[in-house]
Amino acid sequence: FLPDETLLMTSGEGFEHREDAQSLTSELGKVLRFDVDGKPRGLAGKGPNTRTRIWSYGHRNPQGLVHIPETDEVLLHEHGPRGGDELNRVFRGENYGWPLVTYGVDYSGAYVSPFQRAEGIREPLWTWTPSIAPSGMAWYNGSRFPAWRSSLFVGALVNREVRRLEFRNGVVQREEALFAELDERIRDLRVFDDRIFILTDSELGRLIEVLPH
């Protein structure tokens, strides 16, 4: 939920319908925005005084979505095909490129597109190649872990670790791998009341609270 009590929700492009991510008549491959009663709060529709639920488009498989209170921004990560996982800053009406541009290739090794960037396409804040398979995501700007202020935590399923992206003035300054010693798939992360929690998945999955040294 955003501060105005509207809801953002993501949708994938359905694997076999990748071109629909570019279509404004399809809700596949989109970030959608609506009120709690379901009323669309996205882009203008075709009729007068109508709206769609589409907020941004050109997404492949968006998953993590987080609102940054300090700047009122929304960050989103999404899975690329083979390589090309992305972190994006979400803006109303912006095109994020899939499948016209990508930093990855198809699972067969063939090109999805020969282009990594194009005019009119919003470029990602950060990319991961090879893929890390990003999972849960959480923003931290508290006082309990002062060295981690202004950091985005992203679960990395493939690497079985957490990636910390350090931000300064809205730009990623560096990336750090954490908690690899757990050797567990990181499914989700949450920040609550200045506390950081990690959820792992498996038959022995755990909910772990991170404690200061």
What are the functions of these language-model segments?
Residues 189:
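Short alpha-helical "switch" segments that flank and position catalytic residues
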Residues 4-8, 13-176, 184, 194-198, ...:
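Beta-propeller domain segments
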